[in-house]
Regions:
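A generic alpha-to-beta junction signature in SAM-dependent methyltransferases
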Residues: 26, 50, 91, 123-124
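S-adenosyl-L-methionine
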Residues: 61-91
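Glycine-rich SAM-binding Motif I of class I
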Residues: 40-44
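Conserved class I S-adenosyl-L-methionine
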Residues: 28-38
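C-terminal substrate-binding/active-site "lid" region of AdoMet-derived donor-dependent transferases
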Residues: 103-159
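Class I SAM-dependent methyltransferase Rossmann-like catalytic core
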Residues: 1-30
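Conserved SAM-binding motif I beta-strand of class I
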Residues: 53-59
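Short SAM/SAH-binding signature in class I
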Residues: 92-102
Length: 159
C-alpha cells in the first residue's frame, strides 16, 4: 500500500471514528477535548460535528492552520499532564476526548499514553468516549464503528 493510500485510510478511520463517538455522547452534558492540536484538522472537524459543544484543546505549541485556531480561552498551551490537571480543577466534564499525541517512536508513544491515562480519566465524564491513536490504560475498550480495521484507532468509554 502506498503512503498516500495509508494516510487516506488513517484519516477516513479517524473521521468515521470521531463521527461515531460524537453520536455516542450526543445526550451527555459536557465539553469536548482534543489532546494534540497539530495542524487543526481534528479540532475543526469536532467543532463542526458538535457545534453546540465547547471544544477544548491541549498542545505544546500553537502551529495549526489559521482557520483552525481555537479561542484563547479554549487553548491550554503546555505539556499535557499539567494542562489536564488544570482542566480537572475546572470540573468541566469532558464527554468526548481525542488523544493524538506522539513522538513518532512507538514505544515512547505507548509509554506516554499509559502515563497520561490517569490524568485523562480525571477530566472525563461518566459515559464519556475517548478516540485514541495510542493504547490507553484503565478504560473500557469499545468495538467502535464498523469498517475501521482493528488497531487503526482505539475507542474507550469511561464507566
Amino acid at each position: 500500500m502506498s503512503r498516500l493510500d495509508s494516510m487516506l485510510r488513517r484519516l477516513t478511520a479517524q473521521r468515521d471514528g470521531l463521527n461515531w463517538a460524537a453520536e455516542q455522547v450526543r445526550n451527555l452534558a459536557g465539553d469536548v477535548l482534543d489532546i494534540g492540536l497539530g495542524n487543526g484538522r481534528t479540532y475543526d472537524h469536532l467543532r463542526e460535528t458538535l457545534p453546540d459543544r465547547r471544544v477544548r484543546v491541549i498542545d505544546r505549541v500553537l502551529q495549526c492552520h489559521p482557520s483552525c485556531v481555537p479561542p484563547e480561552a479554549d487553548f491550554l498551551q503546555g505539556e499535557a499532564r499539567p494542562m489536564l490537571d488544570k482542566l480537572a480543577q475546572e470540573r468541566s466534564p469532558i464527554i468526548l476526548a481525542h488523544y493524538d499525541l506522539g513522538f513518532g517512536v512507538k514505544e515512547k508513544d505507548i509509554a506516554e499514553a499509559a502515563a497520561l491515562s490517569p490524568a485523562i480519566a480525571a477530566v472525563m465524564a461518566q459515559g464519556g468516549v475517548i478516540v485514541s491513536g495510542q493504547p490507553l490504560v484503565g478504560f473500557d475498550e469499545l468495538d467502535g464503528p464498523q469498517g475501521i480495521p482493528p488497531g487503526r484507532y482505539l475507542f474507550y468509554q469511561v464507566r
